[in-house]
Amino acid sequence: LVFEALGNHLVAEPLLGALLVGRALTEAGTDAQKAQLEGIIAGTLLAALAHDEPASHYELNRVATTARKDGAGWVLNGAKAVVLFGDQAQLLLVSARTSGAVGDEAGISLFLVPGDAAGVSARGYGRIDGGHAAELTLSNVKVGADALLGAEGAGHALLERVVGFGLLALSAESLGAMDKAK
């Protein structure tokens, strides 16, 4: 109902990121990670899913961004494309490959990365619908072990579920826009 109403009024707000990241936290987060849900729900913590890449062609398993273990944490390198509100997000849910080849379903891990982390750079731009997106570059971004969301290498299944919820929300938004256009 919320996304249908947003579509009915053509509201370009960062709620999709809140839905996607919130759902992922709810399903796979530790208690400490889930504590961020309060800020997402209150609207004081802007969250974004940073998954699509320049050559991914909407295939969830095509992840070239890498995460390698570094002491007690991880170092992320790669590029993310069309990250909704990515240059404004305070929390990024980043997919990265911890093992396997670029097209493998296994080996994708999910990381919670502060939007202002050292090594994260963003080029933001407006979208035709009035929304905002960004191209992100992750260059030697260091995060702690507690940034890993869920099990290492098992992020694909969670991505499928979360993106499925997002597609339902976008369908409702489209329905609202079409209803308004009648």
Identify the meaning behind each predicted range.
Residues L15, A55-Y58, V82-F85, Y125-H132:
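Short Gly/Pro-enriched turn/cap motifs at secondary-structure boundaries
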Residues G7-N8, V120-K182:
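Glycine-rich beta->alpha junctions and the first turn(s) of the following alpha-helix
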Residues T65-R68:
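A structural signal for short hydrophobic beta-strand segments in well-ordered beta-sheet cores
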Residues L1-E38, A42-G43, F85-L91:
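Internal helix-loop-helix
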Residues V21, L45, E59-V63, D87-Q90, ...:
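A generic structural signal for well-ordered coil/turn residues at beta-strand boundaries
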Residues V2, T30, G78, V94, ...:
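Residue-level signal for inorganic ion chemistry
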Residues G43-P54:
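A short, Trp-centered hydrophobic/proline-enriched beta-strand micro-motif
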Residues N77-S121:
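A short core secondary-structure module
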